[in-house]
Amino acid sequence: MDPFLVLLHSVSSSLSSSELTELKFLCLGRVGKRKLERVQSGLDLFSMLLEQNDLEPGHTELLRELLASLRRHDLLRRVDDFEAGAAAGAAPGEEDLCAAFNVICDNVGKDWRRLARQLKVSDTKIDSIEDRYPRNLTERVRESLRIWKNTEKENATVAHLVGALRSCQMNLVADLVQEVQQARDLQNRSGAMSPMSWNSDASTSEAS
């Protein structure tokens, strides 16, 4: 089964009936009332949102918004795990950004607006993020980073993030991002060298 559908099925099976009712209410502006009356599970609702392209594997913002409204941080973590897995199968730069995002989300607190502005996220979008995630600081940070990434596209790099953090005097967080990046680089180099080393050892054994 498609990994994104597996995620949605997992989320759906973890929702209570009252939470499903709340989700249906939150989606009134997106899904018609008659359609919502037919919804019997979270998966029914997610399927409708998929049909309307409101939900996609690469665009989980709405799913995050809905789960944040329910304060289901455990389910938000499943979305994080899904995105981390998707990044692992993507280009190395994408995987590096995902790792940097996790560090920043864990370590940037109430000063997230300053970082968002440094990344050229507009005040209008910052206000919108606050409205969507009134009680979830981590999701505010993550959403602002996502907006920056979608705007910058191929110009979105870890180096750019580190520079923005240092411009905001968030040097400790910048150091943490660089440490994680260096560890990843070392791991990647070790992984690339291992097969060569194995082949070298095998050749030596055969020669002896």
UniProtKB/Swiss-Prot annotation:
Phosphoserine: modified positions = 194
Which GO molecular function entries does the Swiss-Prot or TrEMBL record give? Answer: caspase binding; death effector domain binding; death receptor binding; identical protein binding; protease binding; protein-containing complex binding; protein-macromolecule adaptor activity; receptor serine/threonine kinase binding
Q: Where is this region: Disordered?
A: 187-208
Span of domain DED: 3-81
Q: Tell me the impact of changing residue 25 to R.
A: Loss of interaction with FAS. Loss of self-association. Abolishes induction of apoptosis
At the top level, the lineage of the source is: Eukaryota
Instruction: Name the SMART domains for this protein.
Output: DEATH, DED
Q: What happens when you mutate residue 175 to K?
A: Strongly decreased interaction with FAS
The Death domain is annotated at: 97-181
UniProtKB keywords = Apoptosis, Cytoplasm, Disease variant, Glycoprotein, Host-virus interaction, Immunity, Innate immunity, Phosphoprotein
This protein's record includes keyword DNA repair: no
Kindly state the tissue distribution recorded for this protein: Expressed in a wide variety of tissues, except for peripheral blood mononuclear leukocytes.
Residues bearing glycans: 117
PTM (free text): (Microbial infection) Glycosylated at Arg-117 by enteropathogenic E.coli protein NleB1, C.rodentium protein NleB and S.typhimurium protein Ssek1: arginine GlcNAcylation prevents recruitment of caspase-8 or caspase-10 to the activated Fas (CD95) or TNFR-1 receptors.
- Coiled-coil residues: none
Known outcome of mutating residue 105 to W: In IEHDCM; reduced folding stability as measured by differential scanning calorimetry of the mutant protein; impairs interaction with FAS
**Biological process terms in GO annotation:** apoptotic process; apoptotic signaling pathway; behavioral response to cocaine; cellular response to mechanical stimulus; death-inducing signaling complex assembly; defense response to virus; extrinsic apoptotic signaling pathway; extrinsic apoptotic signaling pathway in absence of ligand
Record: disease: Infections, recurrent, associated with encephalopathy, hepatic dysfunction and cardiovascular malformations: A condition with biological features of autoimmune lymphoproliferative syndrome such as high-circulating CD4(-)CD8(-)TCR-alpha-beta(+) T-cell counts, and elevated IL10 and FASL levels. Affected individuals suffer from recurrent, stereotypical episodes of fever, encephalopathy, and mild liver dysfunction sometimes accompanied by generalized seizures.
Q: Tell me the subunit arrangement.
A: Can self-associate. Component of the AIM2 PANoptosome complex, a multiprotein complex that drives inflammatory cell death (PANoptosis). Component of the death-induced signaling complex (DISC) composed of cell surface receptor FAS/CD95 or TNFRSF1A, adapter protein FADD and the CASP8 protease; recruitment of CASP8 to the complex is required for processing of CASP8 into the p18 and p10 subunits. Interacts (via death domain) with FAS (via death domain).
Function comment = Apoptotic adapter molecule that recruits caspases CASP8 or CASP10 to the activated FAS/CD95 or TNFRSF1A/TNFR-1 receptors. The resulting aggregate called the death-inducing signaling complex (DISC) performs CASP8 proteolytic activation. Active CASP8 initiates the subsequent cascade of caspases mediating apoptosis. Involved in interferon-mediated antiviral immune response, playing a role in the positive regulation of interferon signaling.
Q: What is this protein called?
A: FAS-associated death domain protein
Which gene codes for it?
Answer: FADD
